[in-house]
From Swiss-Prot:
Domain of life: Bacteria
Family: Belongs to the NAGSA dehydrogenase family. Type 1 subfamily.
Species of the source: Dictyoglomus turgidum (strain DSM 6724 / Z-1310)
Protein name as annotated: N-acetyl-gamma-glutamyl-phosphate reductase
SMART domains registered for this protein in UniProt: Semialdhyde_dh (SM00859)
Length: 336
C-alpha cells in the first residue's frame, strides 16, 4: 500500500488528484500539502492528512510518490531546496523539455535543475509506456499535447503524413486554473467563444518536441476557450502521403490503439463528444480522410482535468508501481 503526497492540493488538478486517489485501492495514506486548502470539509476521510507546505520537509522521505500540482516554475522552486522525493510526478511544464534552454525560451524561467532532466520521462503512456515502467520521475503532459499527440500518433507511427499539421483546439475554462482572471469570470465566458495565445501558446513547442522523438511534422496550433467548465475537443487537419480512405484510417487507428484501455476509436461517420468523456480518463478519437484534398481530419475529445491532467498522472503512477493501468480510474462518464 502506498503513502502518497500532493503538493498544491487546492487547485482544480490537485482536487481531482485527491478525489481519485481517495478511492484508489492501493493508496493507504494521502498527504495534502497546501497553505490554503479551503475544501477540507469535502475530503473528510481517515486516509487523508491535510497539512501546510512547511511540513513537506519532515514527511517527504516517508512517501512512496509525490504529485506536484503547481504552476510553472513552482515545482523547480520547491525541489531546488534539495528535498527531492524517491519518486515524483510533476503536473507543471518544469520537466517536460529535455533541453533546459528550450524550457527557458518558452516559459521565461531559468531551469536550475538540468541534472534531473535526463532522469525524467514524459508521461504519455500510450506512446512512452516502456520508459514509464522504469521511471523515477515523470513529467505529466499538458492537456492540449495529450489530445493532439494521441490524435497524430497513429499517422506519424505509420509514416502516413508529412508537412504541416493544423491543430484547432478548444478547452473548457477549468484549463485556465482556479485563480480567476478576466477571461475566466462568468460574465466573459458565458455565451462567448474566443481564441487566445494565437500562434504562441506554450503547448505548441511541447507538442513539437514530442513529435521529434517519434517522427517529423510541423505544427500550427490555435487554442480557444469555450463556455463549458471541463472538457477538450481537438480538431486536427493534416496531409496524407497516400490515397487512403476513411475506412483505412479507422482500421489503422483501431490497430494502433487496440490494446489501450483508455482509448476509444469511433467509426468514421461519428464524432467524439465532450459530454461523453466528462469525468473519465478516456480519449475518444475519430479519423476521416478527405479524398478531394488528401487530408485527414482527426477529432479527439478528452476531459482536460482527468486524461489531460490528474487521471493520466495516476495512470502513470499505476505503471510506475506495476499496477493495472485502469486501477482507480475505471469510471464511466458524468453523462447525461
Amino acid at each position: 500500500m502506498l503513502k502518497v503526497g500532493i503538493v498544491g492540493a487546492s487547485g482544480y488538478v490537485g482536487l481531482e488528484l485527491t478525489r481519485i486517489l481517495l478511492r484508489h485501492p492501493q493508496v493507504d495514506k494521502l498527504y495534502l500539502f497546501s497553505d490554503h486548502f479551503e475544501d477540507s470539509w469535502v475530503f473528510k476521510s481517515e486516509k487523508i492528512f491535510i497539512t501546510d507546505r512547511s511540513t513537506y520537509s519532515e514527511l517527504y522521505k516517508d512517501l512512496d510518490v509525490v504529485f506536484f500540482a503547481l504552476g510553472s516554475g513552482e515545482t523547480l522552486g520547491f525541489l531546488s531546496k534539495g528535498e527531492i522525493p524517491e519518486r515524483f510526478i510533476d503536473m507543471s511544464a518544469d520537466f517536460r523539455f529535455k533541453n533546459p534552454g528550450e524550457y527557458e525560451r518558452v516559459y521565461g524561467i531559468k531551469h536550475n535543475m538540468p541534472e534531473i532532466l535526463e532522469k525524467v520521462v514524459y508521461g504519455l503512456p500510450e506512446i512512452f509506456r516502456d520508459k514509464i515502467k522504469g521511471a523515477q520521475y515523470i513529467a505529466n503532459p499538458g492537456c492540449y499535447p495529450t489530445a493532439s499527440l494521441l490524435g497524430l500518433f497513429p499517422l506519424i507511427k505509420n509514416n502516413l503524413t508529412y508537412g504541416n499539421a493544423i491543430i484547432d483546439a478548444k478547452s473548457g475554462i477549468s484549463g485556465a486554473g482556479r485563480k480567476p482572471t478576466d477571461k475566466s469570470i462568468y460574465g466573459n465566458i458565458a455565451e462567448n467563444y474566443q481564441a487566445y495565445s494565437i500562434l504562441n501558446h506554450r503547448h505548441q513547442p511541447e507538442i513539437e518536441n514530442v513529435i521529434k522523438e517519434i517522427g517529423y511534422l510541423r505544427v500550427l496550433f490555435v487554442p480557444q476557450l469555450i463556455p463549458v467548465f471541463r472538457g477538450m475537443f481537438v480538431s486536427i487537419y493534416v496531409p496524407l502521403r497516400d490515397e487512403i480512405t476513411s475506412e483505412d484510417l479507422y482500421q489503422i487507428f483501431k490497430e494502433v490503439y487496440e490494446d489501450e484501455y483508455f482509448i476509444k476509436v469511433l467509426p468514421p461517420s461519428c464524432s467524439p463528444e465532450i459530454k461523453k468523456v466528462r469525468g473519465t480518463n478516456w480519449a475518444v478519437i475519430s479519423a476521416q480522410a478527405d479524398k478531394n484534398t488528401k487530408n485527414a481530419v482527426i477529432l479527439v475529445a478528452i476531459d482536460n482535468l482527468i486524461k489531460g491532467a490528474a487521471g493520466q498522472a495516476i495512470q502513470n503512477m499505476n505503471i510506475m508501481f506495476g499496477f493495472a493501468e485502469s486501477l482507480g480510474l475505471d469510471f464511466l462518464p458524468l453523462y447525461p
